[in-house]
Amino acid sequence: MAKRCALTFKGPMIGNHVSHANNKNKRRLLPNLRSIKIQLDDGTTKRIKVAASTLRTMRKGA
């Protein structure tokens, strides 16, 4: 399963681990995914993975 938001398609980013000696090693910054149930128009429910930032926007109603 891809680590990607089902609504906004946010996915992993590439960054660096930086030590005190300023050595840089590559790392993946993963989105904060949450599993939620969403009700479809026909009344059935489906489980999708949504980023936490998207979930906050949905709950805010914006």
Swiss-Prot record:
Family named by the database record: Belongs to the bacterial ribosomal protein bL28 family.
PANTHER family linked to this entry: 50S RIBOSOMAL PROTEIN L28, LARGE RIBOSOMAL SUBUNIT PROTEIN BL28A
Pfam families assigned to the protein according to its UniProt record, in alphabetical order: Ribosomal_L28
Keywords in alphabetical order: Ribonucleoprotein, Ribosomal protein
Top-level taxon in the UniProt lineage: Bacteria
Protein name, per record: Large ribosomal subunit protein bL28
Biological process per Gene Ontology, one example term: translation
Species of origin: Helicobacter pylori (strain ATCC 700392 / 26695)
Molecular function in Gene Ontology: structural constituent of ribosome
Gene from which this protein is expressed: rpmB
Gene Ontology CC: ribonucleoprotein complex; ribosome
